[in-house]
């Protein structure tokens, strides 16, 4: 069947819901929270209209939502949920259980700032606070990547038996409408066949226990196997991303998308919708003679160390844009990037710019101002101040 995209004007949240529908998810368990709610509402609409054969489990909290997903996934079902901010924090314990039990659940997290004070706007701290739970994390720049990301996340997760989080920006994507090219169901089915579970609690001929006590003699190896699965996932992510591109014309074979790096003195590095603004700014800066490029981190977990080293070897500096912060330290992407480069031969000048916390706008003008600051760093050959809270009101 020839690929002819079905173009719909949808929000990022509706793109996620359509992707779950097209992935033929079997069980959805979720609890509503702004700005995630319309994902689950749309899925409920699909069920009510007879468009989807999905078992929907209404629960009393996000902790229960993930617990229900764990139970469903452990029986072999393809399982989906979505949450945001405080809801994701409430899920924290169960995220460890899902990863430790090697269950390929896919969850959409709509990035929202953590309270207090209350905020419903974009901030990556909620998802990045869960970086050590064993979940893979894919960050979408736009609504198209939300849709594509969910489909690819299932294929990767079910190959390596590790859960995956697809992350989109609150309101900037979740409630903003754009054209999304959707894939005919028959072609999605060819790309994403039915799940073949690693084990199933519904297989009564081979009964097993999941999450039972492991003594010190065994626990260590369980952790090692999960770590190896994340390493294996890097290869699978590239293979799945390449296949997706060959089938549907949108290539995701690189864990870090780059632009203009061949002759760049420095690059902007960041994740999510912020990088759409960066791309526009870089296009304008290039016309003004700036030797600047960009590196958009698509997959934060597993961390694309090898690709980052290759990029770092070709530039003099990296301006890391973090829409998050680890208190007592610095931006989280900045910390991870420095650690990845420490034992490599690449040692570019690196400066961390904290931007956009709590949904504060980051404009093309802001990026151009940061470019001017980074240009001075390159010209001087030293970093004057490693971490800058850009546009801080005083």
Swiss-Prot record:
GO-annotated biological processes: organic acid metabolic process; response to oxidative stress; sulfur compound biosynthetic process
Catalytic activity as recorded in UniProt: 3-methyl-2-oxobutanoate + 2 oxidized [2Fe-2S]-[ferredoxin] + CoA = 2-methylpropanoyl-CoA + 2 reduced [2Fe-2S]-[ferredoxin] + CO2 + H(+)
SUPFAM superfamilies: Thiamin diphosphate-binding fold (THDP-binding), TK C-terminal domain-like
E.C. code: 1.2.7.7
Membrane spanning residue stretches: none
Signal peptide (residue range): none
GO molecular function (one): 3-methyl-2-oxobutanoate dehydrogenase (ferredoxin) activity
Stored CDD domains: TPP_PYR_PFOR_IOR-alpha_like (cd07034)
Primary enzyme class: oxidoreductase
Organism superkingdom: Archaea
Presence of keyword Oxidoreductase: yes
Keywords: Oxidoreductase
Oligomer and partners: Heterotetramer of one alpha, one beta, one delta and one gamma chain.
Protein name: Ketoisovalerate oxidoreductase subunit VorA
Gene: vorA
